[in-house]
């Protein structure tokens, strides 16, 4: 399979690239590879989905017709091998392996969460929260749960904490840095946001980390903070 433009990923960066290409080039072939289905949803809106404020359609950047309208060959699969000399990418798509030959390549897969090394975490029923699948898995796992600890006070952690309070959960947000959103806000702005989040019902612990997790009474787990 050959294509002029190959894009690995199919979210915000990929969509912007497709629109930019089509604004100056209506004819060249474009192929996008998405590991997730549906393709092209907004990760920052996952907390809104979890809280029940929107459905899956409400978090999509573009509708399904976008790909057809821009004549993009959309492949659902996982890119697992890149040969920069031969300009090829191998993609696992279902039971098939595709080799795609490209002229130009854009990798727009976004980030992956870094799971901290915490004693006992592997048996603690932990959840990541960066994909639609994560949100669906967490939603199922919240059934019958009253208390939730969120590790990380970045955009994902803050948004998730607020969504969880809307679901009636008691939430503790734990951030290693002296204030939340440390890469975005200064201490003063962060303090103002912290007060707003606390009023929403989130307990915030900054300058702290989770040392270990162990089983409490019944099915619950206890996080030891230091």
Listing of model-derived features with the role each one plays in the protein:
Residues 39, 112-115, 216:
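Active-site/binding-pocket entry motifs
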Residues 1-73, 163-188:
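Beta1-alpha1 glycine-rich phosphate/pyrophosphate-binding loop at the start
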Residues 9-12, 130-131, 151-156:
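Glycine-rich Rossmann-fold phosphate-binding loop(s) that bind the pyrophosphate
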Residues 14, 43, 115, 135, ...:
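A general structural signal for well-ordered alpha-helical segments in protein cores
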Residues 1-6, 63-149, 222-226:
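FAD-binding core/adjacent interface of flavoenzyme oxidoreductases
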Residues 27, 74-93, 100, 167-226:
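A Rossmann-like FAD-binding core segment of flavoenzymes
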């Amino acid at each position: 399979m050959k294509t002029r433009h190959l894009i690995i990923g199919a979210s915000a960066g990929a969509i912007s690239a497709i629109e930019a290409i089509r604004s100056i080039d209506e004819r060249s072939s474009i192929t996008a590879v998405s590991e997730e289905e549906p393709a092209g949803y907004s990760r920052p809106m996952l907390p809104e989905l979890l809280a029940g404020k929107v459905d899956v359609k409400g978090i999509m950047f573009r509708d399904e017709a976008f790909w057809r309208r821009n004549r993009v060959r959309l492949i659902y699969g996982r890119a697992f091998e890149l040969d920069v000399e031969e300009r090829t990418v191998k993609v696992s798509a279902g039971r098939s392996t595709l080799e795609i030959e490209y002229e130009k390549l854009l990798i727009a897969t976004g980030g992956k969460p870094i799971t901290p090394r915490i004693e006992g975490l592997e048996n603690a029923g932990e959840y990541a929260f960066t994909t639609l699948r994560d949100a669906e898995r967490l939603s199922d796992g919240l059934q019958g749960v009253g208390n939730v600890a969120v590790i990380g006070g970045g955009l994902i952690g803050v948004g998730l904490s607020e969504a969880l309070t809307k679901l009636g959960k008691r939430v503790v947000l734990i951030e290693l840095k002296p204030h939340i959103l440390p890469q975005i806000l200064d201490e003063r702005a962060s303090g103002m946001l912290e007060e707003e989040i606390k009023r929403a019902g989130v307990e915030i612990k900054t300058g702290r980390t989770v040392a270990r997790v162990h089983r409490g009474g019944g099915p619950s787990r206890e996080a030891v903070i230091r």
